Amino acid sequence: MTSLHKNQVKFNSNITISHTGGQLSSDSGLVLVKELMNIFGFSELAKQHIHIEDERAYFTHDNLSILEQFIMQLIAGYSADSAANLLRQDPVFKAVLDRKELASQSSLSRFLDRLSEENIHELQALNQELIDKARLIRNDTELIIDLDSTHSDTFGHQEQTNYNTHYQTYGYHPLVAFDGLTGDFLKAELRSGNQYTSKGVKSFSHLY
């Protein structure tokens, strides 16, 4: 059977990547995501930028490990924090996050509750530094800011949700910005559903 060349990742010497057509994990692509995060020094950058007020006297999972787990879940397509309970014993997730057991859904929910508005700005700054590193690697010299609004449906009684006449449904109406040349995600700002498309665009366009 033909096999592709094996590659060993740098963040964990016990993991190698190959494809022989045998059994595969549906989330094995996260190994490559983790390798990229390791090359960019994500964990160290997160420690520098993110400072979450935490009054827990005892905990198993620190805030940055929960953040990385949540990011991995979102990248893998698990948008609901409740998926954490199904993934706690997933071998790929445990390997890339270097944890014997992952944080539960309740731990993720409490983590999200701890995030402040200042933490949101810190996450934006972290995102921008990662983009800057990518731009240096690609030797990018031009930037086109593709700025637009979008709609996010809400269900139940969510804070600041409102009716949007254009989409004819309840939800949020956030602003988002991408690099029109590379597709890099530059920035996002959550707004209530009834906000006009261009409201706040001037201040939003000041990137980090």
Positions of the model-derived regions?
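Dynamic "connector" segments at or just before major functional cores
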Residues: 1-170, 174-208
